């Protein structure tokens, strides 16, 4: 079983909202076969607390417009790592140092990547990596 079409379209809507707020290193991972709780993890990086807040707020608004209801939001006060659960999609917005330290891509490397539109990944990645979302594809 792979991520549903609905989960994939929500993921793209969330990724577009994050990209509009200059989120970097966008990656989408299909965790549907490993987790019964959700289909997709969307990962995004923000430069600092204010940037993370702006990304999360934009994603929240886009998901609301798309009809997804937020179940829970964790970590917003500190804004080092914010997790927002929309049921089929869980969005993780991390500051760079936390993203590197926790290395969620590496933890879920056995799960397939969900290809994001090239305009979202190319424009918002500092080093040009992560087209399709997986920076660790060569590792």
Positions of predicted regions on the chain:
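Long, contiguous binding/interaction regions
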Residues: 1-33, 47-54, 61, 66, ...
């Amino acid at each position: 079983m792979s991520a549903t079409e609905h989960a994939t379209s929500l993921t793209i809507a969330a990724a577009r909202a994050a990209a509009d707020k200059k989120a970097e290193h966008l990656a989408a991972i299909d965790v549907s076969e490993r987790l019964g709780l959700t289909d997709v993890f969307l990962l995004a990086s923000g430069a600092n607390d204010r940037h993370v807040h702006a990304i999360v707020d934009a994603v929240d608004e886009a998901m609301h417009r798309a009809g997804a209801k937020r179940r829970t939001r964790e970590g917003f006060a500190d804004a080092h790592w914010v997790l927002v659960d929309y049921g089929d999609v869980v969005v993780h917005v991390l500051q760079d140092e936390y993203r590197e330290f926790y290395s969620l891509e590496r933890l879920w490397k056995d799960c397939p990547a969900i290809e994001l539109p090239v305009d979202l990944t190319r424009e918002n990645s500092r080093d040009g990596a992560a087209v399709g979302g997986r920076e660790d594809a060569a590792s």
